[in-house]
Every structure is written in structure tokens, then in C-alpha cells.
């Protein structure tokens, strides 16, 4: 490499990430180019994988109800609901509630998951459905 290119390379190495991003934008504008990946081979290979990954999300039929957290003053109410939903004994349900975040029910139908979420939230727990 020439001295000029060595000097440019050294200057590029010293740029912060923000400065490098700004430089890329300026180069794109100045030369009318794009730093995005070409629309050829790599993108074509990634597209079917991305489409296949998107399909299961649209057709998801099984959901997990995850208890994220329980305020201390609501623990007993949430514990009762968890016992009703899961059919667990008192000790097992207590262990589950205290181990939050933890899955309460797994691989259940959407309506059952939404119902469980609603009941636990009404009792005071924080829940997510995945």
C-alpha cells in the first residue's frame, strides 16, 4: 500500500462509531452509492429463511403464560389463581410464584392463555404471553 492509503487507514481506525457512521453517510452522498448489502446472492439466500421464520409466528397456536413478577402484598391472591389455573398443590404453586419470572402454563391455546393472563393480572401479578 502507498503512504497515502496507510495514512487514511490509520485515520479510519481512530474514528469513533458515531464518526464512522457519519463518514459512511457522507461517502454515500458524495459518490451516489449505498453501503447496504447488494441485492444479489446473499440477500436471495437470506430471504427464504426470513420468510420461513415469519410463517410460524403468523400460525402460532400454542402460547406460554409467564409470570414475570408479583408484588409482595398480592402474593396470596396470585397464588390462589395460579393453583386454580395449574392444578398444582399449595407448596408447588408457592414455589412457582416465588420463582418468578417463571412459566405458569406452556403450550396452551390462545384463548386459554389470554384468560389465564387476565385472571393473574386481576389478582395483581405481572404476566406476559409468549
Swiss-Prot record:
One of its GO terms (biological process) is translation. One of its GO terms (molecular function) is mRNA binding. Keywords: Ribonucleoprotein, Ribosomal protein. The keyword Ribonucleoprotein applies. Belongs to the bacterial ribosomal protein bL12 family. The keyword Iron-sulfur does not apply. Forms part of the ribosomal stalk which helps the ribosome interact with GTP-bound translation factors. Is thus essential for accurate translation. Homodimer. Part of the ribosomal stalk of the 50S ribosomal subunit. Forms a multimeric L10(L12)X complex, where L10 forms an elongated spine to which 2 to 4 L12 dimers bind in a sequential fashion. Binds GTP-bound translation factors. GO terms for cellular component: cytosolic large ribosomal subunit. Gene3D superfamilies: 3.30.1390.10, Single helix bin. SUPFAM superfamilies: ClpS-like, Ribosomal protein L7/12, oligomerisation (N-terminal) domain. It holds the Pfam family Ribosomal_L12_N. This is Large ribosomal subunit protein bL12.
